[in-house]
Amino acid sequence: MKLCIALDNPSKEENLKLAKELKEYAKELWLKVGFRSYIRDGAEFIKELKLMGYNVFLDLKLYDIPNTMADAAEEIANLGVDMFNVHASAGSIALKTVMQRLEKYEKRPLVLAVTALTSFTDEEFKKIYGDSIENKAKEFAKLSHEAGLDGVVCSAFESKMIKNITDEKFITLTPGIRPFGEDAGDQARVADISLAKEQKVDFIVVGRPIYKDEDPKAKVEKILNKIKEI
């Protein structure tokens, strides 16, 4: 299981400061760049993180018509990121079109599909998608696997189930991890490290519990040690 840190600080300077503080762990860590950081800091920020030796996950959750998604995927691949995501609900044609566009790259980024945002409660999810999170997560995972994607973004509660219906090597990445039971904030379906490991999660994403900690480096060390222990 790998640790991916969400760089969601209010300034580029704060994000770079954190990345520099953790540089000795660059080979063990992934850094997630989301909407806020990418819109504000752009491609140059990605390059700076890559120069420090980090693996970068660009979290933009592409969702559009197939050709537009494929165009965006190509530009993302050109940035040199190591992983990015799309929405599974964009549909099979869109997912396949994205993967076909990336075939020309000798080393392409990993592509994951978002099943259900971890901020959703089951009740809220049903109002929009007409079914339970569990059922739709299964459906979206199968769809993504059949389209040739590398994995999905899901909560820890769906991870093992998804691997059982797709492939053990099909990647699951889980946001909203609260390593040691920290406040859930705006996340509805959170998990700690032990549950994530038990559910065979491949990547855990941790943001606020690290970058809001008084000693982020010590917190990261504690998380990495916990991952190795279990």
From Swiss-Prot:
* List of residues binding substrate: 8, 32, 59-68, 118, 178, 187, 207-208
Q: Which GO terms describe its molecular function?
A: orotidine-5'-phosphate decarboxylase activity
Gene Ontology BP term (one): 'de novo' UMP biosynthetic process
Question: Which reactions fall under this protein's catalytic activity?
Answer: orotidine 5'-phosphate + H(+) = UMP + CO2
Q: Which Gene3D superfamilies match?
A: Aldolase class I
Q: Kinase as a keyword?
A: no
Q: Where is the active site?
A: 61
Alphabetical keyword list: Decarboxylase, Lyase, Pyrimidine biosynthesis
In what pathway does it function? Pyrimidine metabolism; UMP biosynthesis via de novo pathway; UMP from orotate: step 2/2
Q: Name one GO cellular component term.
A: cytosol
State its Enzyme Commission number(s). Answer: 4.1.1.23
Q: Name one Pfam family in it.
A: OMPdecase
Q: Which HAMAP family match?
A: OMPdecase_type1_B (MF_01200_B)
Q: What does this protein do?
A: Catalyzes the decarboxylation of orotidine 5'-monophosphate (OMP) to uridine 5'-monophosphate (UMP).
Name the UniProt record assigns to this protein: Orotidine 5'-phosphate decarboxylase
Native source species:
Nautilia profundicola (strain ATCC BAA-1463 / DSM 18972 / AmH)
> What gene is it encoded by?
pyrF
